[in-house]
Amino acid sequence: MQVLSSLKTAKQRHRDCQIVRRRGKVYVICKSNPRFKARQR
């Protein structure tokens, strides 16, 4: 999982990527290709 300052580019890496907010942090999850997972500080 990458820690990024901006998740806009992380969301555009794959068409299945979606932005989720959990416990005050913003995550990008991708079910079909989990290597695109990312988290914002």
UniProtKB/Swiss-Prot annotation:
Disulfide bonds: none
One GO location term (cellular component): ribosome
Keywords: Ribonucleoprotein, Ribosomal protein
SUPFAM superfamilies: Ribosomal protein L36 (SSF57840)
Pfam families reported in the protein's UniProt record: Ribosomal_L36 (PF00444)
GO term, biological process aspect, one: translation
Listed GO MF terms: structural constituent of ribosome
Annotated InterPro entries: Ribosomal_bL36, Ribosomal_bL36_sp, Ribosomal_L36_bact
Family named by the database record: Belongs to the bacterial ribosomal protein bL36 family.
HAMAP family associated with the record: Ribosomal_bL36
UniProt cross-references to PANTHER family, sorted A to Z: 50S RIBOSOMAL PROTEIN L36 2 (PTHR47781), LARGE RIBOSOMAL SUBUNIT PROTEIN BL36B (PTHR47781:SF1)
Identification of the protein by name: Large ribosomal subunit protein bL36B
Natural source organism: Neisseria meningitidis serogroup B (strain ATCC BAA-335 / MC58)
Gene for this chain: rpmJ2
